[in-house]
Amino acid sequence: MNLCIYEDIEAQAFGALALLRPVFALRCGIFTLAEKLALAFPEARVHLLVRPHLEDWTRELFPDADVAEPPEDDTLFVNGRLCMTDDEVLHFMAASPQEVSYVAQGILFAAKVRGSRVRHVVRHLREGDAERAFEDVRLPAEVQAFLARSGEDLIRWSPRQIVQDARYLFQGGIVRGSVEPGAHLIKPEAIHVARGSRVMAGAVLNAEGGPVVIRENATVEPLAYVEGPAAIGESSIVRAGARIRAGTSLGPVCRVGGEVAETVFQGYANKQHDGFLGHSFVGEWVNLGANTNNSDLKNTYTPVRTFASAREFLEKRGRDSGQLLLGLTLGDFTKTGISTSFTTGATVGIGCNLFGTELQPAYVPSFVWGQPGSFQEHRIDPMVATAERAMERRKVALATALDALLRRAHEETKSDRDLYLGAMAVARRDPQP
């Protein structure tokens, strides 16, 4: 069968997290959204429809998929924001002998389409018009499913997704790696230690609250504590003395120390030292300096407000997230200096270099350098040079397609950044009493 995962116009709601990748490449639980669908249909030929400027980079991210090449046979189309549903629902959709569409919470998110109509559907999906794409498909069926609407949903749903993903693919009570004498496994029947991984003496894996999955070639160093549900990604390292609280998911090749709670690391990110990070989403190639901390709960115990643009921030028009616990969203390639602190629900774009002991603002646009009170633009050439050096340390080359995306994103975010930096300059020149 053919499985076509597509982006819709709501991709923009993910802000900096979706500047350098399709929405379905984001992580929620152990896997990315696309990986969940591919695992549900292991025999399917996967086709991907993304924003045109992402096509080249998507081909490198998903080398086994067809990108922007519509299939010719019957196809199951699924919105790439699909995060949670029952596997039986997915297989029911795929097995349908006729055209049918599926709705969850009033949103049409999937449809089985005959081969003769696939190109019609693809044309309208590329135009961002999912409604017209599927308008002739028979009356939709309502099913139980959840579509992510922002990075906040990925943070909030990740703990439950770790449990579901672990049940789907990782058998508990399996130790294929090395668990050294002196390591402590609490409720070992819910712990999976994959081949090539290492749990060192003095480490504690506690699965009383949910499964703990240690993936291939990962290391949990002495005196580290990992509390389930939790997932430690391929070739990642949990540093000695770290406290990995329930609901945390590390993607591949991360280095994590200090205290982390209910946080998603997309992959290839460093938080080597002490400091707290909670209810947050960390993009790729992020490096957090020692004692970087964030708040994830207001002293007033009221819902956290977030900002999606400089204009919203400057006009104090934050959006009520409805969440009491919400931390930090950090875009790809962003760095922090030692003792950097972030307020509750802060949003930081891609390519930033932030430092200083003063509390960072609740919103920082992409490609900003400096500390509160003296922010300036992070110029693209030195930013890319830093990215290349960081990636070389992990034996990864900066792909031409990703380089081009970074430069495009720098231009794409210019108006937002200029508005923000201009207002900050005025505030420095004419401080309010």
For every predicted segment, state its role.
Residues 1-24, 28-42, 209-228, 232, ...:
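Solvent-exposed, charged interface segments at domain starts and junctions
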Residues 1-188, 196, 357-433:
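Terminal amphipathic alpha-helical/low-complexity segments used for targeting or macromolecular assembly
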Residues 8-13, 25, 240-241, 247-425:
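Glycine-rich hexapeptide-repeat left-handed beta-helix
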Residues 16-18, 46-47, 150, 189, ...:
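A generic short-segment signal for beta-strand/edge and adjacent turn/coil regions
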Residues 17-20, 131, 137-141, 197, ...:
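A near-ubiquitous, low-amplitude feature marking generic local secondary-structure context
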Residues 74, 202, 351:
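Conserved beta-strand and immediately adjacent loop positions that scaffold enzyme active sites
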Residues 173-283, 299, 329:
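Extended beta-solenoid/beta-helix repeat architectures
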